[in-house]
């Protein structure tokens, strides 16, 4: 996209944009009433059918044996399902006599219980989906895999987590009638105050961004991907087989990609040589970027192939709960060259004060570490536009959000694009059998980071972005 190369005239106006080179045209005006419901209603996309469920054999994500279904959040066999349930119900603490990296296969899975349980946790088995009495019929059947930190996995493997839970319940008795699983499920829902039906969205400048930002609720440590029905990982003993892409899957993916605005961002990020960017100017630029990215998400909704299948109220509710995640996902993928290129050049011209460095929060440090990790993960995967479009739709179609009127319809849509994404990755990346689960496990990390950013004070965002962009750009430049 061409930019006006004329030097900025006059002083820095109210937007704090002195020194930045303006584009030839301003961004389109924001909608006046939430998501422009009149414009949304005028669209009439064609109705599409749901592809038939595939009956091909699935393999257990833990050992590669024949899977029998979705157990505690992931596709697994009866053996690993029972082992995980017994280990959690009986609070087992195992030991590995080797290096804690034993091979897991159908024949070798019983040789090391420690490594088997470790892999169950790493692949996303949800221990909170097991009933406390150990009887069949676990809690939270709609919840998919969970992603927990290495520290929490270590607490579970060492037994420390079991001891802490026992102490908690002994101290609280029956004062809390909800189970841990129920509390986790409830806390995963956005607060009623975060829905756009109770507060109209304005996209102009800092005030709206701040109100939206501060109004979001923080997700719990466990972040769920709803309805992980079908991702499969091939055992090393079961090499992937050649397959063809279903024509209907290709058509639906093409429609998803067509709904995306893949043009470069229009927010000016060029800056005069030698110009020293202030904290206020960098913050104003970040707000303008957020405004443009959010506007693109609204335009994206109106172009979705399934637009006519949901109500405007549900779209409003979905976007109010996922907009931060959508912006983060797009910044790490389709707009990463600009964000980690042009924006990184701007942040390099910002020098934080000693006071800013001293007051930087622990929450900010955690966000920095996770963002850098996630950037390298996406950089390694080299996510295609097709995969990005599917990941975005899957993350957006979260039927566990409070206030929805068509949760069952959302479940079917989520399932549809889950299968489509798996079809595409297994077809295009035949020799990367773990690519699809690798992509899907990035989604709970995105949700976690987006939720954690709520705890970072707004005045610390310029420093946070400077550190992340500098670290990522420097490390990639060395490759």
UniProtKB/Swiss-Prot annotation:
Positions of NR C4-type zinc fingers: 60-80, 96-120
Span list, region Sufficient for interaction with UIMC1: 172-252
Record-annotated NR LBD domain positions: 248-479
Biased composition (Polar residues): 178-198
Subcellular location: Nucleus
Family annotation (Pfam families): Hormone_recep (PF00104), zf-C4 (PF00105)
Binding site for Zn(2+) 2: 96, 102, 112, 115
Matching PROSITE patterns: NR_LBD (PS51843), NUCLEAR_REC_DBD_1 (PS00031), NUCLEAR_REC_DBD_2 (PS51030)
Gly residues biased stretches: 9-18
MF term (GO), any: zinc ion binding
Keywords for the protein's UniProt record, in alphabetical order: Developmental protein, Differentiation, DNA-binding, Metal-binding, Nucleus, Receptor, Spermatogenesis, Transcription, Transcription regulation, Zinc, Zinc-finger
GO CC terms: chromatin; nucleus
Bias-annotated ranges (Basic and acidic residues): 165-177
Region: Disordered, residue numbers: 1-32, 131-150, 162-198
Entries under SUPFAM superfamilies matching the protein: Glucocorticoid receptor-like (DNA-binding domain) (SSF57716), Nuclear receptor ligand-binding domain (SSF48508)
Gene Ontology BP terms: cell differentiation; regulation of transcription by RNA polymerase II; spermatogenesis
Family annotation (Gene3D superfamilies): Erythroid Transcription Factor GATA-1, subunit A, Retinoid X Receptor
Family: Belongs to the nuclear hormone receptor family. NR6 subfamily.
PANTHER family: KNIRPS-RELATED PROTEIN-RELATED
Subunit structure: Homodimer. Interacts with UIMC1.
Protein task: Orphan nuclear receptor that binds to a response element containing the sequence 5'-TCAAGGTCA-3'. Acts as a regulator of embryonic stem cell pluripotency by mediating repression of POU5F1/OCT4: binds to the DR0 element within the POU5F1/OCT4 promoter and inhibits POU5F1/OCT4 expression during embryonic stem cell differentiation. Involved in the regulation of gene expression in germ cell development during gametogenesis.
The protein's name in its UniProt record: Nuclear receptor subfamily 6 group A member 1
